[in-house]
Amino acid sequence: MMRKIIGKIINIVLPPKGQEQASKEAPPPTTEVKAVSLEQLLGGALGDAPAEPDLRVIGLYSSVEDEKIAELTQALLYLNEMNRLLPEGKEKKPVEFYINTYGGSADDMFAMYDVMKQVMEETEIHTIGVGKVMSAGTLLLAAGTKGKRKIGRNCRVMIHNVAAGNFGNLPNLTNELEAIQRLQEDYISAMVENTKFTRKKLEKLLNEKVNIYLDADEAVKYGLADEIM
């Protein structure tokens, strides 16, 4: 009995005769490496290759501050460069820009605004306001490609004057006030350029109220967006 058990164990552990020699002579397995073509990188735009998912969506779901604006700037410039690589005659693809923010820095707002205007010389930016679009976020919503700006039915919009919180001696405060006044003028000019507000109407509203709240219908009425989703 013991011999039969040992024999079975040996048969299980040891390979059949001839198999060991064959495995030594067999060539090593090869690894197939597949290159990613330019067509795939461009979502199949340059040929008939199956398109990879073409994600051209960016989003601002935080404060308007330098680190986030740096990320969005890099993304916009990259997506615009991808459009430049398309062959002549191919339709350029837009970028969808979702905005949901309480606002933030006026300087960073203008940094993003200027980049958007530069990119839109070649690539459409479809802005989409959801949730809340307030303070510095309102200009970014309005700055999208005209006719392609959307807003959620339940989105809240809020506009107010440029604010600052620096303190110091009188000369510093005077200097700071002059800078804020210039920034305020630039903000009003940009809003008038990108919305249906007249300068007189916007200045009147800003002087009457600390915060101006608009619902989706009012945002479309005043030209911050073109349609409600």
How should each PLM-predicted stretch be described?
Residues M1-M229:
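Terminal-region recognition feature
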